[in-house]
């Protein structure tokens, strides 16, 4: 009975390790695929424009229309 329990625990640990490593490898492979894709080499960081401190009058008018 003890041997069966130990075999069950070892099997569960190995299965859990396999499941987690598969998720890690999947995430790494999708990241590499994104880098090598058509849009992967472009800088798609849109957060640089958020901190623009100079606003034109057209920008202010657009913001006023949004806040109505």
UniProtKB/Swiss-Prot annotation:
Keyword set includes Metal-binding: no
Major location category of this protein: secreted
Modified residues (Leucine amide): 36
Protein's cellular compartments: Secreted
A single Gene Ontology CC term: extracellular region
Proregion span(s): 37-68
Keywords associated with the record: Amidation, Antimicrobial, Cleavage on pair of basic residues, Secreted, Signal
Signal peptide residues on this chain, from the entry's feature table: 1-23
Tissue: Expressed by the venom gland.
Presence of keyword Magnesium: no
Role summary: Probable antimicrobial peptide. Shows low inhibitory activity against herpes simplex virus type 1 (HSV-1).
Family recorded in the similarity comment: Belongs to the non-disulfide-bridged peptide (NDBP) superfamily. Short antimicrobial peptide (group 4) family.
Protein name: Antimicrobial peptide Eval655
């Amino acid at each position: 009975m003890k041997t069966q329990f130990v075999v069950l625990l070892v099997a569960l640990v190995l299965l859990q390790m396999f499941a987690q490593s598969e998720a890690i490898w999947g995430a790494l492979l999708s990241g590499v695929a994104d880098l090598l894709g058509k849009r992967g080499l472009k800088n798609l960081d849109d957060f640089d424009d958020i901190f623009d401190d100079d606003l034109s009058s057209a920008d202010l008018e657009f913001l006023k229309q949004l806040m109505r």
